[in-house]
């Protein structure tokens, strides 16, 4: 019975560890010319947690593997990206027609 209890607790703890937020970083560029985009909003979908890209188009934030990042910038199509197991996320935004 104790073995079963320890097995259950071990599985439950591993799920909790997997769901924890991890630092994610990346870069957002323009699909038109490959230049970094400054000031792109990067938000975790369904939350108010987010950040903006810097002068190099780089961003950093904490997110879980199940989180979806929403990238938005004036004049560009909004893009959603599932974090998954990626710690580095490269995103290209396309201009609106």
Give short role names for the model-derived ranges.
Residues 4-13:
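Sec-dependent N-terminal signal peptides
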Residues 7, 18-97:
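Periplasm-facing N-terminal accessory domains of Gram-negative outer-membrane beta-barrel systems
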């Amino acid at each position: 019975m104790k073995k079963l209890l320890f097995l259950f607790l071990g599985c439950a703890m591993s799920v909790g560890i997997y769901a924890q937020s991890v630092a994610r970083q990346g870069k957002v560029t323009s699909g038109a010319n490959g230049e970094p985009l400054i000031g792109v909003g990067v938000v975790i979908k369904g939350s108010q947690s987010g950040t903006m890209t810097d002068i190099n188009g780089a961003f950093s934030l904490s997110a879980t593997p199940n989180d979806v990042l929403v990238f938005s910038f004036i004049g560009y199509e909004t893009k959603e990206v599932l974090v998954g197991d990626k710690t580095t996320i490269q995103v290209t935004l396309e201009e609106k027609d």
